[in-house]
Amino acid sequence: MALSGHVLIDPARLPRDTGPELMWAPSLRNSLRVSPEALELAEREAERARSERWDRCAQVLKNRLLRVELDGIMRDHLARAEEIRQDLDAVVAFSDGLESMQVRSPSTGGRSAPAPPSPSPAQPFTRLTGNAQYAVSISPTDPPLMVAGSLAQTLLGNLYGNINQWVPSFGPWYRTMSANAMQRRVFPKQLRGNLNFTNSVSLKLMTEVVAVLEGTTQDFFSDVRHLPDLQAALILSVAYLLLQGGSSHQQRPLPASREELLELGPESLEKIIADLKAKSPGGNFMILTSGNKEARQSIAPLNRQAAYPPGTFADNKIYNLFVGAGLLPTTAALNVPGAAGRDRDLVYRIANQIFGEDVPPFSSHQWNLRVGLAALEALMLVYTLCETANLAEAATRRLHLSSLLPQAMQRRKPAMASAGMPGAYPVQTLFRHGELFRFIWAHYVRPTVAADPQASISSLFPGLVLLALELKLMDGQAPSHYAINLTGQKFDTLFEIINQKLLFHDPAAMLAARTQLRLAFEDGVGVALGRPSPMLAAREILERQFSASDDYDRLYFLTLGYLASPVAPS
């Protein structure tokens, strides 16, 4: 291609507002040569660069997918290894028990050694190692149950052994929850079992849901200064019992172990309930009444402080009862030189004697104060629901252990009858004031805490968590205006915890979801205790959502979190 030089045009011949222009014209003297080899080389280099970039992107994607797959495989291996370790611990504990039985009761005269008496939960116990088996009783009308871990999780594993003949149904709430989970776009596929599309719920989904409920009040900060909420509540209640005994607490020794602390639990709780009725302190049963949004985003004090802002618990009835009795001395009193200031703090003395010096005074490090108050309110609600009960079998009863565990129950009754154990013959079904709660405390709470000293209120009573969450949703609605919720938003927090655990693994999002669930539980317990009749409000929800029709059903629901009934598979 040829181009010419520039041509100058005379401006005089152009209009006034037109300037000179440079024009180009073709010329044979100007040419542009293009090398085919250079074009081919440039094309090859560009193709190679594109290929290398694509390979790098593909390799990065493969590495990420491989990392996710290896993470899943490692989690599965760790879970299987943990199950094997728990089984080995159970075998070791069982063999140790057999050896100790042979040492204590050797056979003589060719006769077999007499069977050792079954341990009584009311007697002092020692901590069980690993995931060892232990016996619990929920109702005096039923035989004891051997469990490993939690009662709710252990029983779940026994409900799916014969799904060809029958499957467990858990009531309207779980049926709605399962249907809502199957409709969500983001949900772990390993929880989408075939039973979720029938009248039942798959074992994996039930296991995860119950695990979330049991972990509602468990401490997730791993701070050595933090106590389990049950232990913090017991320290507060027992200290109040000793303090209100006047000078008698000076002669009565302080509890020196967790066993002694647990032994005083029912008595101290009854003392607090009686004084709340007699003294009527101001306030309500809500842990947090402040409208500050930041205060509801974290359970721990804000800005890494040890104490909450002044007036945080000023509207709580139990806190006002303790302050009025002088149970919680001020920080100024604790800072008095010498030991006299700390000696006046009965709560600190009990905590220091049982748990050591790692636990600071409740008045200065208020995490234990907060979780203790919340756990006390939860125990008060359990006590109220079990205050008077009739465990006689009703025609509308939903839970029947003889239907869920037919073979085990048939084998158990003759053995119990020959040994003279409770449950093999007619027992008491009507209980006086607080009598049933003391039975549950002695035969369920104490053995469970012996097996797991870190047991929390939610792990002991997962059904109480569900009840409180439902009461929180109904707060502010008149009984005649209860609307049918079609949105499924009440399951959002529950499913968010499951998604973070199995899919996303975001610590910040998991912390926010667990905090939201715990605050909702605390609010629900406060709403229930604030009702004129907590028993009537609880009965309505338990019957409508979980098909609990009598005191027996309600008792088992509190400790299990579900009521199973066998139905034909569809």
From Swiss-Prot:
Ranges for region Interaction with major capsid protein/MCP: 1-54
Q: Which Pfam families match?
A: Herpes_UL25
| One GO cellular component, as annotated | host cell nucleus
Record-annotated membrane-spanning stretches? none
Q: Tell me where it resides.
A: Virion; Host nucleus
The protein's job, in short, is: Capsid vertex-specific component that plays a role during viral DNA encapsidation, assuring correct genome cleavage and presumably stabilizing capsids that contain full-length viral genomes. Participates in the interaction between the capsid and the tegument through interaction with the large tegument protein/LTP.
On subunit structure and binding partners, the annotation says: Heterodimerizes with CVC1. Interacts with major capsid protein/MCP and triplex capsid protein 1/TRX1 at the pentamer vertices. Interacts with the large tegument protein/LTP.
What protein name does the entry list?
Answer: Capsid vertex component 2
Organism name: Epstein-Barr virus (strain B95-8) (HHV-4)
Lineage of the organism = Viruses, Duplodnaviria, Heunggongvirae, Peploviricota, Herviviricetes
